[in-house]
Every structure is written in structure tokens, then in C-alpha cells.
Amino acid sequence: TIGFIIKMDSPGGSSMAKYDYEMALNYARSKGKKIVGHIDGMACSAGYALMALCDEVYFTNPHDTVGCIGTMCAMLTNKDGDVNTVTQERYAEIYADGSPYKNKEYRAAAEGNYEGIKEELNRLCADFQQMVRERRPRVTDDQLTGKTYDAGDVVGTMVDGQGDFKFCVNRVQQLAGVSQ
């Protein structure tokens, strides 16, 4: 194996996945492997995090979507004692005496106080943005604000160019110094 192509078509996922991606790709690099990202559709949020970690990134269609760099959280705000109006089931949370801080931020959010969760989101967002800045040094500040872009409009910053899968195979070979 001389390298890897990571094919991407994803709107995103868990921001925590970034850490696993980073460990896996750094391990491959430590073994001298080249990594090329290939976007065929969408590379947004956590999907773009994986692309940013690649040595080079190419897209199939200039209208493929990239970006959405940022973090968010969606949650149901059930509170202890809430009753489902359809089933009449009661939501209950019971905590051990030794766990007063367990889910504290989520319980606060159910009461309308989002500061604890927002603090965590801000930390994860800053870490995500820093990783993208390090791996894609020409990315603009505006491209780190959660916006999405047509891949053809961000060549040189978020992506390296246009190429099909065969092109990406050739790039891995070239980067690895293997004749074709």
C-alpha cells in the first residue's frame, strides 16, 4: 500500500470523530503513506474535517458542496417529570447521590440555560477551526464560520482542484513517487 484515497459524500457527523480521523491519518503518514481526499457530492462539517486532514483534496463536480465548519447541538429538552401528552408516559431522571454534576449542562438546557453546552460547543469549534487552519493554511476566516461553498469556488483554499477518482489514484502514485 502506497497511500489512501478517502472518498467523501457526507453532510457531517459528530465533532468528536475529528480526533479519531486525526489519529488514523497521522498513523498512516508516520508509515510514509500519502492520503488524497476525493469529494463526490458533499464534504461538510465533520466530513470536511476528514478532507482537511488529507494531503490533497479534489472534487468531482464544481458544484460539490464543501465547508460548514463549525459545531452545533440539537436536543430534546425533556425535564424530569415531563409527561408525554399522547402516551401519558412520564419522563424521569434519577441520579445517584454521588453524581450531582452528571448531565448538569443538559439539565440546565432543559430549563432554558444553554451556557454550559455553548461553552463546550465553543471549545470544540475553536479546536476544529484550528485544525483546519493548520492543515489548510490558505483557508479564509470567512470559510471557518459555518458557511458552505461550491467546491469550484474555493480552489486553493479549501480544496486543491478538480479530478475524478482515477485522477486521485494517479495523484497518490505521484505523491508516493511510484511510476504509473
Question: Residue locations for each model-derived region?
Answer:
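Small-residue-centered hinge/linker elements
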Residues: 1-33, 42, 48-135
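A mature extracytoplasmic/lumenal domain signature
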Residues: 8-12, 39-43, 163-169
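A local structural motif
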Residues: 34, 136-143
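Glycine-rich beta-to-alpha transition loops that act as phosphate-gripper elements at the mouths
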Residues: 38-44, 143-148
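Short, well-ordered alpha-helical microsegments
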Residues: 46-47, 151
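C-terminal long alpha-helix characteristic of the crotonase
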Residues: 118-138, 155-180
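Acidic helix/loop microenvironments that form the catalytic cleft of cell-wall polysaccharide enzymes
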Residues: 142-158
